[in-house]
């Protein structure tokens, strides 16, 4: 009586290859979560009432890094907005006077403008932040477990079927 171990050996080799590629797989999953968080941030910017910023620059400047950062057994990815005023929209700011003037429906900033300017926010008050990044991360974490399981199962099935 004999036993054919060829398929079992192929399966063992496939598992060894998957184990060797695990850093690459985890990187792909984590970067995908960053992309999902960016999509959520853009959706929040688009659908928030009242509108966050009219021009769309704030919405279009959300990005995530294309490489995951490993720290021990955990991974992270950066999600960011590099606009100069992004931090002020995220966390809020003190009310202040802005020199300049109106030309039609557009405010033109001009330092030491003799025509005056406008006061942003309530007098001696605080303009509350919109917390877009915080809300996007919260939305991402709500569905993260199911999304990661689905992606990981798909990746593992592809890699296991590739070798058989």
Question: Model-predicted segments: where are they?
Answer:
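Acidic, low-complexity proline/glycine-rich segments
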Residues: 1-9, 112-116
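Short helix/strand-capping connector loops at secondary-structure junctions
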Residues: 121-140
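C-terminal or internal capping secondary-structure element at the end of a domain, subdomain, or sheet
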Residues: 136-164
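Glycine-rich, flexible loop/turn motifs
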Residues: 4, 85, 128-129
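Short, low-complexity, charged/polar segments at coil/turn and helix-coil boundaries
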Residues: 13, 17-123, 154, 158-164
